[in-house]
UniProtKB/Swiss-Prot annotation:
Changing residue 434 to S: No significant effect on transport activity. It is a multi-pass membrane protein. Changing residue 492 to A/Q: No significant effects on transport activity. Reduces affinity for inorganic phosphate. No significant effects on growth rates. GO terms for molecular function: manganese ion transmembrane transporter activity; phosphate transmembrane transporter activity; selenite:proton symporter activity. CDD domains: MFS_PhT (cd17364). One of its GO terms (cellular component) is fungal-type vacuole. Changing residue 145 to S: No significant effect on transport activity. It comes from Saccharomyces cerevisiae (strain ATCC 204508 / S288c) (Baker's yeast). Residues 89-108, 155-156, 223-250, 367-395, 441-442, 507-522 are cytoplasmic. This is Inorganic phosphate transporter PHO84.
Length: 587
């Protein structure tokens, strides 16, 4: 072969290598596709890239991924804690210690409303334009809206609650977008053996967010102690006290942006998710390879016979794989696919389980005032003592129930499995809510405290963690984000129902019948028990995804065979079927 032809081949090889490179990659998200960009066969390149992800061990790379992906959940839970305490602080500034009930509900529910929009909107968008192009956008929305909240002030022309509610709805859109994106990106980058633990650890950042909020609140209350402790009631909170409270809630909410800003670079520079790049964008590459068949004559005319043979083999492989590739994502195909019961029941199971859980998960907070009173961290009218007790009391409850539950899930979800943990959690919670509801007045304060902590534990070592993990694994790549968004949005709808409709039931006819406040709380707990019972049945619809690759899950539960796996099997079958005489003849 002449030196000119050799140079031409080397240039062509470098060009092909460059053609297969993808953008992005940083310390938290390694670009596995670029490790195999030199492989010309798209199916072989796909197989090797996915194998390198699935077989990877657990190390610092995964710890960094957990940190970067988990910051959104940390910010979300931090904000929930901050706004609950912030509302108390605001009430001293604008309402002499007693914010109207509708205003409180509006500020608390507004974030959930935005979250529903973000979960569905960003979830769908990530399947249309890709994960890389929008990952980080939701964090930018959260950061900007959090900063804007700290600048809101009251004036005759501007309603304080209305403006703050608007910013919280928009911030909720960012928070909602983080649910499907962080879940599916973590899932698609995670090693098969520890995928559940990695996804669970991302979600467990919620506990750290609540703890961070409590610690920062304690520091702020201690720092402003001199401006608060002399006010023994909201009426006694004068201009000095009001200024301190006004500064505290703004600092408390504003500090929620710090970790988000620190992690923003890593989100904006991630590579495209390998599964999305290979599953959704692969058809274009395979179609281009198939066009080589049209140039078969031109290939034979070249002086390099080996290049011609290789070109024909690649074209043949591409044509074969096109027939086995999943259909292109579209609304019509989505309806066709999930309109079939064997596929649609999985979406019903994930969405239904998340809905039933969140009704009770957010409704359980209705008992918080009673629980804090029991452990001696409620009841004081002194401004300093009330803020201090609220922060410390909630920290105790989080560390007693929520935090252990999250991490027991993380350490066992890849051993026990997702479905058994979720099923057992719903069964135990059904029993616990029945006890709380039907024996409420016989339990006593300490009995109620014990059951409250146990409920918190089994919600997190149970469906609260698994309802986040399973939707990120059990759907085809082209609809994984959309389906996760639908499931998560269903949960938030349940939360809104709990905070509005069921939340108001606790005082149903109490004043009319001359009964104390919260007289209907036991019956509300019984309603929550019914939702937990429904969760048992929705859990039966979901598959077990433990220790299976995403491609194996797709083949098992959606009947879509990975083209690279099929190609690899066919090659092995061809080798095994070849007789020794044939192999000797070929040699």
């Amino acid at each position: 072969m002449s030196s000119v032809n050799k140079d031409t081949i080397h240039v062509a090889e470098r060009s092909l290598h460059k053609e297969h490179l993808t953008e992005g990659g940083n310390m938290a998200f390694h670009n596995h596709l670029n490790d195999f960009a030199h492989i010309e066969d798209p199916l072989e390149r796909r197989r090797l890239a996915l194998e390198s992800i699935d077989d990877e061990g657990f190390g610092w790379q995964q710890v960094k991924t957990i940190s970067i992906a988990g910051v959104g959940f940390l910010t979300d839970s931090y904000d929930i804690f901050a706004i609950n305490l912030g509302i108390t602080m605001m009430s001293y500034v604008y309402w002499h210690g007693s914010m109207p009930g509708p205003s409180q509900t509006l500020l608390k529910v507004s974030t959930s409303v935005g979250t529903v929009i973000g979960q569905f909107g960003f979830g769908t968008l990530a399947d249309i334009v890709g994960r890389k192009r929008i990952y980080g956008m939701e964090l930018i929305i959260m950061i900007v809206c959090t900063i804007l909240q700290t600048t809101v002030a009251h004036s005759p022309a501007i309603n304080f609650v209305a403006v703050l509610t608007f910013y919280r709805i928009v911030m909720g859109i960012g928070i909602g977008g983080d649910y499907p994106l962080s879940s599916i990106i973590t899932s698609e980058f995670a090693t098969t053996k520890w995928r559940g633990a990695i996804m669970g650890a991302v979600f467990a950042n919620q506990a750290w967010g609540q703890i961070s909020g409590g610690i920062i609140a304690l520091i702020l209350v201690a720092a402003y102690k001199g401006e608060l402790e002399y006010a023994n009631s909201g009426a006694e909170c004068d201009a000095r006290c009001q200024k301190a409270c006004d500064q505290m809630w703004r600092i408390l909410i504003g500090l929620g942006t710090v970790l988000g800003l620190a992690c923003l670079y890593f989100r904006l520079t991630i590579p495209e998710s390998p599964r999305y790049q290979l599953d959704v964008n692969a058809k274009l590459e395979l179609a281009a390879a198939a066009q080589e068949q049209d140039g078969e004559k031109k290939i034979h005319d070249t002086s390099d016979e080996d290049m011609a043979i290789n070109g024909l083999e690649r074209a043949s492989t591409a044509v074969e794989s096109l027939d086995n590739h999943p259909p292109k994502a579209s609304f019509k195909d989505f309806c066709r696919h999930f309109g079939q019961w064997k596929y649609g029941k999985i979406l019903l199971g994930t969405a239904g389980s998340w809905f039933t859980l969140d009704v009770a998960f957010y409704g359980l907070s209705l008992n918080s005032a009673v629980i804090l009173q029991t452990i001696g961290y409620a009841g004081s009218k002194n401004v300093y003592k009330k803020l201090y007790d609220t922060a410390v009391g909630n920290l105790i409850l989080i560390c007693a129930g929520s935090l252990p539950g999250y991490w027991v899930s993380v350490f066992t979800v890849d051993i026990i499995g997702r479905k058994p943990i979720q099923l057992a959690g719903f069964i135990i919670l059904t029993a616990l809510f029945c006890v709380i509801g039907f024996a409420y007045h016989k339990l006593g304060d300490h009995g109620l405290l014990a059951l409250y902590v146990i409920c918190q534990f089994f919600q997190n070592f149970g469906p609260n963690t698994t309802t986040f993990i399973v939707p990120g694994e059990c759907f085809p790549t082209r609809y994984r984000s959309t389906a996760h968004g639908i499931s998560a949005a269903s949960g938030k709808v349940g939360a809104i129902i709990a905070q509005t409709a069921l939340g108001t039931l606790i005082d149903h006819n109490c004043a009319r019948d001359g009964k104390p406040t919260n007289c209907w709380l036991p019956h509300v707990m019984e309603i929550f028990a019914l939702f937990m019972l429904l969760g048992i049945f929705t859990t039966l619809l979901i598959p077990e995804t433990k220790r299976k690759t995403l491609e194996e899950i797709n083949e098992l539960y959606h009947d879509e065979i990975d083209p690279a796996t099929l190609n690899f099997r066919n090659k092995n079958n061809d080798i095994e079927s070849s007789s020794p005489s044939q192999l000797q003849h070929e040699a």
